[in-house]
């Protein structure tokens, strides 16, 4: 590719200028990173449950005295460390004393405790054995906004007489965000040293390893900065940073390996620095450009899921891949032009080039001598690794994604296991009419709908909410099944089959979002996969000038992706290594 060779010579002659511009770009990325952005949990909007949820927000009146701003809530579970009953006056006094600082905080809208509500409602706020009680706390701001100050509120609740656990939407979401950030930092702290050691083995030179790793670092900075810049103009998922870090480091090191290795080979063959850079970019650089295109194509498949968090993941991934290609063709060759032969400095004495060549040459020779047995054995192993993929079960994330030792997870387990009704799940049914839902005819239709829903399997009760909107009536349905169980999903589907005279039935709630999200993904996945395969074949055909090789590449990708998903199912869903890795087996 002659343009890349010419570009390599330009970079060599203007290496300090190219390096300066690259560093300015890194500085801009750092500035964008420091400016931050609002990363959030992006919902599925274009689904029945999403439309029903929006309809409720638009139509239902705000309760009297409720704030005009959005609110969210969490619960505090109290247990006496002196074995007092939750109805004991000393227990109640200690609980209220611990809650007084919350009541005085301007960010807290309300605090509901068992002693402040009617006896029938209070029973639901005490555990089955009567030893624990919970307080429901409503705060200003949505779940994401409240998560910013939740830690400060939690620190206000202290007591020497009662033990306290916080759980609910706000602390669970806060802990998920915190866990993601901690995992991101841990991944960086672990992956960078491991990558450096592997590069030392590959290059046998500390200088070449540091150059390659340095490109990975600046690519990650650029990717995170680009993601935060994207977040200032559109919704970006909180998981985007994980994608940027993992893909950015891997791709940047991969591309740098290509160029640095080819550059050193040309120097070893007697080329001067300028020619070595030109040849490296014309060969390895060409492969990098097409590799970046194919990786971006794969990530672009996520754009076929509009209205979901996957779009932002695809955009963030594409940004970091583009930055990887950009720095591999600018920042890296500028460094190589400055270092020249010194890129091989600080050589390790125990990593000689001949032995490494003999190792890989020997492996390749053995494979070529017995291609059919090696192929059959490899495919058989991959098929075995992929076999658990056939039992894949999809579900939305819930509290079980958190480590069991976290307070919000422990509180969730106590809440579900010890408080009446908390082990059940709810379904919200919206009956929408063209006019007043309180008219005589519509009242009768809603009551008929309630009766039919109450008779469905796995329904413990179905009630008509006293609150209605200009065009909607609301029913609340309780089921003894957990939100992500097959029975709860079947119930959502069964309710959606129930008609209401003169109107339309919409179902929302956690289980409905789960059902709709999975269905949404399954409907669009074939189109996304078809797009990725077709465009990848086209890109590889233009690169290789072959029809067979692109098809082989697609087949290898299918096998490797299937094996990867098989490993995920085997570990995460089936629970192998759960004790070692400290997680709860769950759907993916």
Regions found by a protein language model. Give the residues of each.
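Acidic beta-strand-to-loop metal/phosphate-binding motif
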Residues: 74
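Disorder-to-helix initiation segments
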Residues: 41-42, 49, 246
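Membrane-embedded transmembrane helical bundles of large multi-pass transporters/channels
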Residues: 1-37, 108, 123, 128, ...
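Structured non-transmembrane domains adjacent to transmembrane bundles in polytopic membrane proteins
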Residues: 45-71, 80-173, 391-580
């Amino acid at each position: 590719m002659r343009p890349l060779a010419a570009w390599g010579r330009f970079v060599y002659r203007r290496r300090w200028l190219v390096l300066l511009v690259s560093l300015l770009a890194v500085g801009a990325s750092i500035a964008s990173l420091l400016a931050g952005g609002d990363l959030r949990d992006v919902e599925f909007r274009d689904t029945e449950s999403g439309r029903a949820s929006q309809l409720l927000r638009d139509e239902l009146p705000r309760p009297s005295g409720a704030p005009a701003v959005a609110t969210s809530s969490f619960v505090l579970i109290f247990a006496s460390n002196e074995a007092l009953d939750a109805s004991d006056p000393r227990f109640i006094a200690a609980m209220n004393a611990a809650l007084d600082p919350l009541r005085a905080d301007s960010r807290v809208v309300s605090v509901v405790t068992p002693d402040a509500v009617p006896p029938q409602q209070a029973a639901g706020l005490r555990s089955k054995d009567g030893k624990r009680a919970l307080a429901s706390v409503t705060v200003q701001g949505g779940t994401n906004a409240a998560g910013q100050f939740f830690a400060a509120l939690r620190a206000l609740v202290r007591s020497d007489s009662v033990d306290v656990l916080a759980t609910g939407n706000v602390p669970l979401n806060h802990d998920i965000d915190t866990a993601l950030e901690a995992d991101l930092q841990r991944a960086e702290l672990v992956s960078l040293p491991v990558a450096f050691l592997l590069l030392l083995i590959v290059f046998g030179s500390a200088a070449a390893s540091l150059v390659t790793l340095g490109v990975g670092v600046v690519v990650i900075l650029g990717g995170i900065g680009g993601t935060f810049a994207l977040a200032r103009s559109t919704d970006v998922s909180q998981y985007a940073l994980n994608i940027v870090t993992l893909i950015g480091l891997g791709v940047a090191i991969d591309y740098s390996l290509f160029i640095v290795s080819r550059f050193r080979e040309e120097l070893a063959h007697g080329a001067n620095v300028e020619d070595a850079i030109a040849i490296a970019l014309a060969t390895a650089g060409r492969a990098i450009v097409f590799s970046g295109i194919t990786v971006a194509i794969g990530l672009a498949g996520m754009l076929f899921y509009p209205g979901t968090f996957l779009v932002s993941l695809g955009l963030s991934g594409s940004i970091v891949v583009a930055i990887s290609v950009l720095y591999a063709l600018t920042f890296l060759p500028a460094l190589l032009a400055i270092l020249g032969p010194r890129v091989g400095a600080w050589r390790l004495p125990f990593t000689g080039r001949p032995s490494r060549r003999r190792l890989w040459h020997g492996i390749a020779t053995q494979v070529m001598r017995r291609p059919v047995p090696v192929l059959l054995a490899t495919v058989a192993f991959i098929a075995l690794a992929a076999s658990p993929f056939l039992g894949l079960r999809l579900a939305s994330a819930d509290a079980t994604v958190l480590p069991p030792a976290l307070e919000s997870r422990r509180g969730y387990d106590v809440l579900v296991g010890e408080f009446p009704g908390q082990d059940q799940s709810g379904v919200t049914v919206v009956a929408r009419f063209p006019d007043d839902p309180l008219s005589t005819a519509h009242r009768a239709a809603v009551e008929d709908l309630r009766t039919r829903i109450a008779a469905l399997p796995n329904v413990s009760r179905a009630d008509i909410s006293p609150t209605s909107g200009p065009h909607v009536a609301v029913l609340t349905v309780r089921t003894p099944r957990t939100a992500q169980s097959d029975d709860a999903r079947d119930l959502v589907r069964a309710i959606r089959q129930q008609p209401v005279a003169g109107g339309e039935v919409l179902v929302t709630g956690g289980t409905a979002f789960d059902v709709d999200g999975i269905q949404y993904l399954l409907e669009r996945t074939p189109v996304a996969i078809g797009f990725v395969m077709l465009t990848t074949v086209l890109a590889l055909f233009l690169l290789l000038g072959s029809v067979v090789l692109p098809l082989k590449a697609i087949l290898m990708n299918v096998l490797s992706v299937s094996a990867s998903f098989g490993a995920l199912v085997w570990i995460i869903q089936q629970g192998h290594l759960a004790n070692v890795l400290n997680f709860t087996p769950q759907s993916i």
